[in-house]
Amino acid sequence: MGTVHARSLEPLPSSGTDFGALGEEAEFVEVEPEAKQEILENKDVVVQHVHFDGLERTKDDIIICEIGEVFKAKNLIEVMRRSHEAREKLLRLGIFRQVDVLIDTCHGEDALPNGLDVTFEVTELRRLTGSYNTMVGNNEGSMVLGLKLPNLLGRAEKVTFQFSYGTKETSYGLSFFKPQPGNFEKNFSVNLYKVTGQFPWSSLRETDRGVSAEYSFPLCKTSHTVKWEGVWRELGCLARTASFAVRKESGHSLKSSLSHAMVIDSRNSSILPRRGALLKVNQELAGYTGGDVSFIKEDFELQLNKPLVLDSVFSTSLWGGMLVPIGDKLSSIADRFYLGGPTSVRGFSMHSIGPQSEGDYLGGEAYWAGGLHLYTPLPFRPGQGGFGELFRTHFFLNAGNLCNLNYGEGPRAHIRKLAECIRWSYGAGIVLRLGNIARLELNYCIPMGVQRGDRICDGVQFGAGIRFL
């Protein structure tokens, strides 16, 4: 009997945070002619054994959970498909540098005429790995250095130390991550961190030292994360010209909060989707588990994408949120919402919409923002089928509002206030997709509905990030 080799044409990932996210991979099959005919003549096959070559410190139980479906295959094509799926699951664990699959006919005294053996040839990651990369955040770039201890206890546990230095934020943290065997989407993590950020639109500097524990799990078609966070916050003035409203916020505070996040995401891409929808809902309750900060905070994000003729895409998005202080204390400038900038309401400067004092923007306790977008190929389609496919022409209309509410007035008064003094803008530009890392926008913006105190960016505006309105 002959041998069937199954291997992917795509290169395997050797590092990175998104292990095993390989997408749809082509399969290359080499079959000896006589063996192929003999195997395919058998309508049904049985996977008798699954072997692993190359395991050193990985425990058997977590491996068994990932390859169980291979034994359920009933024909050769199904064996290859399920073996490929098992390979992707193994790569997603983030403990192997390489996984190859070998499918062979079964040998030995107990071998059945239609029996198959599947062998996974694996190469484990080293006990200590390092990484260096750059990241693009909310209109901010940063350099990231990391050290990682993969597969620490043999069941895909991971300890990571990361240092990040950016234009507005510097952070370092230590985290422990443990997935549930057989269900990678169910995982538990603990984080220790320190973050120092500068917010020039508020003349504010903030240093957070904290610890958090979170549990993530899927439920039907949704993903959920439950989190507890305790953080010691230190607020200070970034400049001597800081307003009195910012100066009186300076000092130390302790926040202990419970939060829940739900995500439904059917988009084909998180950076520049062509189809699908996204719904994110976040709730946070602070004060009931300790600390001197108490509030309830809710916010959501909705996005719909629809492909049109001529390779165009119509996209619409809606954001909103509300923060309600508990007790007699006012909300902190560190907890409020901010709006404006190239990643939200375009045509306005970064976080420069809403309540302000002496030029310092203080944020708001309620906001909404919406956008309509039309993405089309570049005129005359330069670079079609190649580099030119990373670019899109962008037409947009954005609107939103940010304010503080008097919670004794009732819902109708709140809606009326959010509907007053709406800021809006429109324009056009070019979008560049940087793989699955980030996207860049260069737009010509025309801000409208400008209110007193708003800081605008009339004309060309550049934006970089992952999350855009």
UniProtKB/Swiss-Prot annotation:
It comes from the Eukaryota. The keyword Transmembrane applies. One of its GO terms (cellular component) is mitochondrion. InterPro entries: Bac_surfAg_D15, D15-like, POTRA. Coiled coil: none annotated. Its main location: mitochondrion. Pfam families: Omp85. GO terms for biological process: cristae formation; mitochondrial respiratory chain complex assembly; protein insertion into mitochondrial outer membrane. Residues 45-125 form the POTRA domain. The modification N6-methyllysine is found at residue 255. It is a multi-pass membrane protein. Keywords: Cytoplasm, Membrane, Methylation, Mitochondrion, Mitochondrion outer membrane, Transmembrane, Transmembrane beta strand. It is found in: Mitochondrion outer membrane; Cytoplasm; Mitochondrion. Plays a crucial role in the maintenance of the structure of mitochondrial cristae and the proper assembly of the mitochondrial respiratory chain complexes. Required for the assembly of TOMM40 into the TOM complex. Its C-terminal part seems to contain many membrane-spanning sided beta-sheets, that have the potential to adopt a transmembrane beta-barrel type structure. Belongs to the SAM50/omp85 family. PANTHER family: SORTING AND ASSEMBLY MACHINERY COMPONENT 50 HOMOLOG (PTHR12815:SF18), SORTING AND ASSEMBLY MACHINERY SAMM50 PROTEIN FAMILY MEMBER (PTHR12815). Associates with the mitochondrial contact site and cristae organizing system (MICOS) complex, composed of at least MICOS10/MIC10, CHCHD3/MIC19, CHCHD6/MIC25, APOOL/MIC27, IMMT/MIC60, APOO/MIC23/MIC26 and QIL1/MIC13. This complex was also known under the names MINOS or MitOS complex. The MICOS complex associates with mitochondrial outer membrane proteins SAMM50, MTX1 and MTX2 (together described as components of the mitochondrial outer membrane sorting assembly machinery (SAM) complex) and DNAJC11, mitochondrial inner membrane protein TMEM11 and with HSPA9. This is Sorting and assembly machinery component 50 homolog. The gene is Samm50.
